[in-house]
Swiss-Prot record:
The protein's enzyme class: transferase
Pfam families membership: Leu_Phe_trans (PF03588)
Family: Belongs to the L/F-transferase family.
Localization in the cell: Cytoplasm
Organism, scientific name: Burkholderia orbicola (strain MC0-3)
Designated name of the protein: Leucyl/phenylalanyl-tRNA--protein transferase
Length: 254
């Protein structure tokens, strides 16, 4: 049975999360609240919320866990060509934390293959905006001709980045933002991005699964490190335009 957490109840051990033979593998607990303090505690333990309107807040710690190592990011020839074009053209920009709430709302509205509705509820937007105000959530945004056309957002503690969602209004806009994030994290020496769940899109970009135990051990170490800076622009993309960067076709985004 999934435990119900009251306002002052701690998270149970992640080993108590439901297993693969259940209908909800990785489900750890449920609660009525999504307070910033609870959200921070969750991320520091390798736990994340994922639920829909009308449901209680559901907390997850799946095993295995999908991650992306920045050094293993794959760049397709077509994306490499796009990045070169973005670097040359002044109408293309990469902005950081310029419109965090707007990126979240755009992610909530983006259609997802095989999904109805959105898990990015008004409550989720409020909670993550609070993390953004405290410097623990960030948006990486692709702009063209002064208009935001794609981006992503996630949570950051110490030397760990937890990816949440991305969207694109024009072709490759989300990939440009992700590539900029990857290039920046490479510069900073970050070793892992949490991707939460396995998708063909993430796998095509170099994502892979690791055991939950290994993931949580890395999180505990990484979040204890000093935070990295979050100021960069599209110039970081130059590091990904070498022909040595390779990749495969892409699929569904979260």
């Amino acid at each position: 049975m999934v435990p119900w957490l009251g306002p002052d109840d701690p998270f149970p051990s992640i080993e108590r999360a439901l297993g693969p033979a259940t209908g909800a593998p990785g489900l750890l607990a449920a609660s009525a609240d999504l307070l910033p303090s609870r959200l921070i505690d969750a991320y520091l333990r390798g736990i994340f919320p994922w639920y829909s309107d009308g449901q209680p807040v559901l907390w997850w710690s799946p095993d295995p866990r999908m991650i992306l190592v920045p050094a293993e990011f794959k760049v397709s020839p077509s994306l490499r060509k796009t990045l070169k074009r973005v670097l040359r053209a002044p109408e293309w920009e990469v902005r950081v934390d310029h419109d965090f709430a707007g990126v979240m709302r755009a992610c909530a509205q983006a259609p997802r293959r095989g999904q109805r509705g959105t898990w990015i509820t008004a409550e989720i937007i409020d909670a993550y905006t609070s993390l953004y105000r405290s410097g623990n959530a960030h948006s990486i945004e692709t702009w063209h001709d002064g208009r935001r056309v794609g981006g992503l957002y996630g949570v950051s503690f110490g030397r760990m980045f937890f990816g949440e969602s991305m969207y694109a209004d024009v072709t490759d806009a989300s990939k440009i933002a992700l590539a900029a994030l990857i290039a920046h994290l490479r510069e900073q020496g970050l070793e892992m991005i949490d991707c939460q769940q396995n998708t063909s899109h993430l796998a095509s970009l170099g994502g892979r699964e690791i055991a939950r135990k290994a993931f949580v051990a890395h999180v505990r170490s990484a979040v204890a490190e000093p935070p990295i800076p979050w100021q960069f622009d599209k110039r970081v993309l130059a590091a990904l335009t070498s022909p040595a960067e390779t990749a495969a076709p892409t699929g569904t985004e979260r």
